[in-house]
């Protein structure tokens, strides 16, 4: 079992640091793919005057029947709506009904008011073995909210049946083998889509000689063979420290790797780029990829995305974690509209996964002047309405 350390600790030669500090030659290890800025709120009521101290004004206080109620500010709600518009959310009857989505993350705080109507279908704690859902980090709650919130914030597909596998610990990191177990559990529990807002450094070689622990890539590929859709974060090492490829297991060919954009639809600078040309040096080895499997495949909101916090309030999240859940939700809406693509005894298979990836490639909104795949922008920006239309052929 690989040792996991929080940020700032110096690892010994036998220990592995969090994933966004990893060099290409290290083994995969996971941490949350978002930088969540918690909003600390202090409310004081004196002589009928309500004072709110909230970084970024992400929350507001309402006095109702003598009670103090917390809610997102208009600024946060407007930003939420702007991102829905950016990805062309259909805002119609499709809400993910009949679709089972599994989130592998740090857990979920089901007591948040915006998650009161979440349709929890299953929970498994691979870290501490607890039987009741909880989140001792907060990242999982934030990601779940993007998908299934149904309060002040509205999730992309908030009527899906939600499974949650806790594979990340209180420091936000976890072991690749545990993530693999979590993916296997998702599939055995009936998930149609698995959402992985996490990632690790790729291995030195793009293949295995056998032996050792089962990897998250192995689990993802086995799931895809059964027709389960795997969506994973491209990673947050964009810029001068970018290692030239997306994180693992997003780097697996049939996994849908999701990069990030700003509210203006431009490339988010922290989003990992993908190298679709193949290379030998510098390590890791990257083999050439072909359409529709070039990395990342698609980009979605990743900068200051309004999210739920596990203290019952709201915050902003930067990272391809958030972008991943937007694409997960889009696929859930697609499966609701075309249930014949849902994995099952007489339905889903790996060919369906490639078909959906092709529709994604055909329906995205490319950046101005873009022709074909871009290593930072993928095939383009998620366009949910166009994806649904493309599926109707």
Where are these regions (language model features)?
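N-terminal targeting leaders characterized by basic, low-complexity, disordered sequences
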Residues: 1-21
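Substrate-binding/access-modulating region of protease and related hydrolase catalytic domains
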Residues: 2-8, 33-36, 58-60, 167-254, ...
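N-terminal domain-start motif of subtilase-like serine proteases
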Residues: 29-47, 63-102, 128-134, 271, ...
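Subtilisin-like serine protease catalytic core
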Residues: 89-121, 131-175, 251-254, 264-265, ...
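Extracellular S/T/G-rich loop segment that most often corresponds to the catalytic His/Ser-adjacent loop
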Residues: 100, 105, 247-336
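Structural recognition of the beta-strand scaffold that forms the well-ordered cores
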Residues: 100-103, 161-166, 192-197, 224, ...
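Solvent-exposed loop/turn segments at secondary-structure junctions
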Residues: 107-110, 126-127, 153, 168-172, ...
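Hydrolase catalytic cores
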Residues: 163, 167-168, 302-373
